[in-house]
Amino acid sequence: MTEKLLEIKHLKQHFVTPRGTVKAVDDLSFDIYKGETLGLVGESGCGKSTTGRSIIRLYEATDGEVLFNGENVHGRKSRKKLLEFNRKMQMIFQDPYASLNPRMTVADIIAEGLDIHKLAKTKKERMQRVHELLETVGLNKEHANRYPHEFSGGQRQRIGIARALAVDPEFIIADEPISALDVSIQAQVVNLMKELQKEKGLTYLFIAHDLSMVKYISDRIGVMYFGKLVELAPADELYENPLHPYTKSLLSAIPLPDPDYERNRVRQKYDPSVHQLKDGETMEFREVKPGHFVMCTEAEFKAFS
């Protein structure tokens, strides 16, 4: 995991509202390496989903760069170049109920990408590819002629995964793909994603708020707070040695299966004033140890190092 697939440099996504400008994503910089899963966590409204949508060009970025294989995602592109980019980068959406067209059969939903990119030369080849994708995600080829309302939430999300895989992408953004599913189904979907990653060499940006599941699937984890990345580290390192107070507060909220311990456990609350900024001082995203980055002051950086 030394070759960079994606480079995000000072990404900003601001929205103008009648009450003022909302800085949903505010000066974000990080890299994603080929073959890895980068988890992105934070509370609702922190900007993690907006980050994913900005990376894949569903939103035009206010400022900053997103480089995919060295090429600027938000730069001007010909239709041919745009099609090439869209084929290499796909998204699995959060809501398996709203993200599938209820008027289309499963075959047409999955094959839509095949049709756009002209990847199937004949109807027979098209249907054969649909059947292969259905079986890849654990469904039957008999499901091809059914409609989304005939499936459970977990099955619909598998259809969404099959749709994303149809064009053989390199990079998939999974925007809270399990949050709308029952707990019993969540592990099945995550295990499926891990298996597909091994088979096809996929790279994931896995966006979620379930910290235990993020640790299970991710190689590295980034923590977002109010549009900013406050900590980024390998998954085990982040859980064993969290440095930013906000990360500590998130981890303290994870319930543990020990009633006696939970009864006496004190949850940590994050207070931004704890950083004690001096006049004119700003928080910076610094590398405190190899691969472990924290948003901190100069004094905190010295203490962490």
UniProtKB/Swiss-Prot annotation:
Membrane topology label: Peripheral membrane protein
Catalysed reaction equations from the record: a [peptide](out) + ATP + H2O = a [peptide](in) + ADP + phosphate + H(+)
CDD domains: ABC_NikE_OppD_transporters
Free-text disruption phenotype from the record: Inactivation of the gene does not affect the sporulation process but causes a defect in competence. Disruption does not affect resistance to bialaphos.
SMART domains, alphabetized: AAA
Major subcellular site: membrane
Binding site for ATP: 42-49
Gene: oppF
Cystine pairs: none
ABC transporter domain location: 6-251
Ranges annotated as spanning the membrane: none
Protein's name in the database: Oligopeptide transport ATP-binding protein OppF
EC number(s) stated in the UniProt entry for this protein: 7.4.2.6
Keywords, alphabetical: ATP-binding, Cell membrane, Competence, Membrane, Nucleotide-binding, Peptide transport, Protein transport, Sporulation, Translocase, Transport
Enzyme superclass (EC): translocase
Gene3D superfamilies from the UniProt entry: P-loop containing nucleotide triphosphate hydrolases
Induction of synthesis: Positively regulated by TnrA under nitrogen-limited conditions.
GO cellular component: plasma membrane
